[in-house]
Amino acid sequence: MEIIMIFVCGILASISVYLVLSKSLIRIVMGTTLITHASNLFLITMGGLKHGEMPIYEKNISQYVDPIPHALILTAIVIAFATTAFFLVLAFRTYKELGTDNVERMKGVLDDD
C-alpha cells in the first residue's frame, strides 16, 4: 500500500509543479496548495500505514501507532489553510489593482503609468 501512495504523491507533486509554472495566479495558488497536500500525504505514508492502538489506552498492546506523524500533519494542514487563504486574498487584490491575473502581463503594468 505504501508503494501506491508514494506513486500518488509523485503524481500530485508533478501536477503541482506544472500548475506553479503556469502564468495564471489562480493556477499558481492551486499548485502551492496541491504541493502541500502531496507532502502531507508523503509524510503520513512514511509514518506507516498500519493498524494499531494508541499507546495511552492500555499497557499490554502488541502493536502501537506512532502519533507524531499525525500531529505533524494536523499542524501542516492548518498552516497550509492559512497560507492558501493569504495567497488567494493576495491574488484577488492583485487582480483588482492590475486588472489581470497573468504573470507575464504584470511585469510592465506599473511602468506604463
UniProtKB/Swiss-Prot annotation:
Q: Which UniProt keywords are listed?
A: Antiport, Cell membrane, Hydrogen ion transport, Ion transport, Membrane, Sodium, Sodium transport, Transmembrane, Transmembrane helix, Transport
Q: Does the keyword Manganese apply?
A: no
Question: Listed GO cellular component terms?
Answer: plasma membrane
Subcellular location(s) of the protein: Cell membrane
GO MF terms held by the record: antiporter activity; monoatomic cation transmembrane transporter activity
Provide the GO biological process annotations. Answer: proton transmembrane transport; sodium ion transport
The name this protein goes by in its record? Na(+)/H(+) antiporter subunit C1
Taxonomically, what lineage is the organism?
Bacteria, Bacillati, Bacillota, Bacilli, Bacillales
Q: Which gene codes for it?
A: mnhC1
